[in-house]
Amino acid sequence: RLHTNFVVARSFFYFTRPLIGLDVTIENEHYLQNRPAIMVGNHQSMVDTVYLGRMFPTSSIILGKKELLYVPFLGQFMWLGGNVFVDRKNRASAIKTMDSIGAYMRKNNLMMIIYPEGTRSHLATPDLLPFKKGAFHLAVQTQLPIIPVVCENYYRLYDSKTRFEGGRLRVAAVSYTHLTLPTKA
């Protein structure tokens, strides 16, 4: 079940890439082999699912909003892959979900993929939205490293008001240092 995400993500990438003309270059991909860990990335649009498919590490799960369960096909594949869903409208439930995930990650040697902005930015400039705290609370709770992954701004390729133009996209995994974090966030 834990390899479902990898198979679906890679299949989606190799099927979609020629249709939309997207060439993805991943820098420092070897950083994504570290497990268990928390991968955080910037979230621009649904195009992120394409490049994520190219770089999706084996034994990885995604943290997503509960509403994704109801998106046709995507929701079913995410559920089958053992991904984790949080109810963003119910803080107590979201905290309970995050508290339970750490032991599961260690037991199964998993990487958790989180977009800490919590939503897609759709920005024409290479800016980030404010981060939600979940990924960082999880890092403190589990003492797992955070691996930042940065995708260049691709507004020049895709603006939600225009047709996707295709092109080259650079994504980089950033080196991390495993720090001993304080046990309170």
Predicted feature descriptions by range:
Residues 1-21:
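N-terminal membrane-anchoring alpha-helices
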Residues 18-176:
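Soluble catalytic domains of membrane acyltransferases
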